[in-house]
Every structure is written in C-alpha cells, then in structure tokens.
Amino acid sequence: MSTGCLNSSVPSACRATASTLYVVFAGANDLNDGQTNMSVPVGILQTSIERLFTAGARQFLVINLPPLGYTPRYNGSQSTITTYNTRSQQFNSALATMLNGLKTAHSTIALNQLDVYSLVNDARANPQLFGLTNVASSASKATL
C-alpha cells in the first residue's frame, strides 16, 4: 500500500488485507524539524493507522523512536543529547497512549510495538553483548 493511498481524500480507494503485517515507523523527521508538540506527529500516525484499519488492515508493528540524542546529528553536547532524548521519550509516551486508545477502540486490531528506544539504551549500556565496541562516537566526522 502506498502513502498516496493514505493521503487520499477517497478512503474507498484504499484496500488492505487483514493477513498482512503493516510496519509503522515515523516521527524522527518531525523532531528533527523542531516539533515539540508530540500530539501533532502522533496524531498523524493515528490517522494513518485508522485509514489502514478502515481499509482492512488488522496487524500492525509500530516502532517507537530511538534516543535521538545519541545520533550523530545531536551527540555533540550533553545539552543537545538530553534535549533530543527527552523529546524521543515524550514522543514514545504519546505514541504508547495513542496505541492503547486504538486497542480499546478496535477490538479486532493487533498492535505490537518494537521498543527501539530501550534496545539502543541496552546496546549503549552493554555494547559487548551486541558485538560492539564504540557506541558513543560517530563513525565519521563528515558533515552531511
């Protein structure tokens, strides 16, 4: 299913199958663009999931945001790390609340969440368990 279907003003044009797993991973660009009101990007995700549900989708894997402060774009200072990790936590909290609401509203929806935030924190705390050695520095000093 294309994003064009999700953005269509004609929901009947969208067809989804109940047996397909729909993976939803979004929000980082909103935070990169300075969004601090998490209801905006989470609301957009909710609308997209609702459209897919209306079109027939029933199985979803929703991936939360990693701690964006640890990404090369933001790991230059402790202040920036803290700011973007906090924003990621705020987004993830709003996302979890929204997903719980969808589960309550739709008894036939299967919503599973992949907690990437915790996975990244686990890798930073115990890099050897993941076969990693340096989890704090950027791999490249190049500016994109």
Region roles according to the model:
Residues 1, 41-49, 53, 84-87, ...:
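Stable alpha-helical elements in mature extracytoplasmic
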Residues 2-39, 58-59, 66-74:
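Oxyanion-hole/transition-state-stabilizing segment in secreted/luminal serine hydrolases
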Residues 11, 34-41, 77-91:
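Residue-level preference for long, well-ordered alpha-helices that form the structural scaffold
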Residues 17-22, 54-61, 106-112:
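Loop/turn elements at helix/coil->beta-strand transitions in domains of secreted/extracellular proteins
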Residues 38-43, 48-56, 128-144:
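Extended low-complexity acidic/polar segments
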Residues 49-50, 54, 63, 100, ...:
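Helix-boundary and membrane-interface capping/anchor signal
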Residues 61-63, 90:
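A sequence-level detector for low-complexity, Ser/Thr- and acidic-rich stretches
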Residues 67-85, 89, 97, 101-104, ...:
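Mobile gating loops/cap/lid regions near enzyme active sites that modulate substrate access
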